[in-house]
């Protein structure tokens, strides 16, 4: 499992740090949060820094995860950001009418059939979903603000629409504070630690150890 891979990354002796290689357009906010909290917990326990290296993309849940690192490095053309929440679906009301299908649903609980795609869209149902999205979006914004700290300028956040699900190139992400610098994993870490540093990889992260 991913948790075991992360634990293995932090389990070596004389670890100088852990590098996360991130290439993700996003996913579940819950899973992103759980993984991030575990990384931070192990980082504090082992007293080692964590570095995130974004390859093609760290968007939405992928960026949530990147924020678990102490520093975020990107490539100039990496895609970074998308700090927002989305849900999507389809409506099949007219389709079942045309093909002559009668749908029968039996449920208990007023909201059990929330946003049923075979029923006309109900404004009350939509409000339930948008309220939930607003809550999760605020959690995401709070997390980014907490982890990036004073590297995020309040005026820049508003001007650039950072918390409005906007995406940025790696170069621009560095300018607005979503990333720290341009850099490739081995080059950055050799400059930071030692030219003779040893890289020990797992499926999900790289353990950095000095000779």
Where do the model's predicted regions map?
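N-terminal organellar transit peptides
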Residues: 1-75, 86-211
């Amino acid at each position: 499992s991913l948790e075991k891979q992360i634990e293995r990354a932090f389990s070596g002796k004389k670890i100088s740090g852990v590098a996360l290689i991130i290439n993700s357009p996003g996913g579940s906010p819950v899973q992103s949060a759980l993984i991030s909290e575990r990384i931070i917990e192990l980082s504090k326990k082992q007293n080692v820094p964590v570095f995130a290296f974004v390859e093609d993309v760290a968007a939405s849940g992928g960026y949530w995860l990147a924020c678990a690192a102490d520093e975020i490095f990107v490539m100039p053309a990496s895609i970074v950001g998308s700090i927002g929440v989305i849900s999507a679906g389809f409506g099949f009301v007219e389709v079942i009418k045309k093909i002559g299908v009668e749908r029968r649903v039996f449920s208990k609980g007023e909201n059990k059939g929330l946003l049923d795609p075979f029923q006309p869209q109900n404004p009350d149902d939509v409000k339930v979903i948008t309220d939930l999205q607003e809550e999760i979006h605020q959690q995401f914004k709070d997390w980014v603000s907490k982890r990036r700290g004073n590297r995020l300028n309040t005026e820049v956040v508003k001007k650039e629409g950072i918390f409005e699900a906007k995406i940025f190139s790696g170069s621009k992400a560095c300018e607005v504070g979503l990333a720290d610098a341009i850099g490739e994993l081995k080059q950055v870490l050799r400059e930071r630690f030692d030219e003779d540093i040893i890289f020990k990889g797992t499926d999900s992260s790289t353990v950095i150890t000095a000779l």
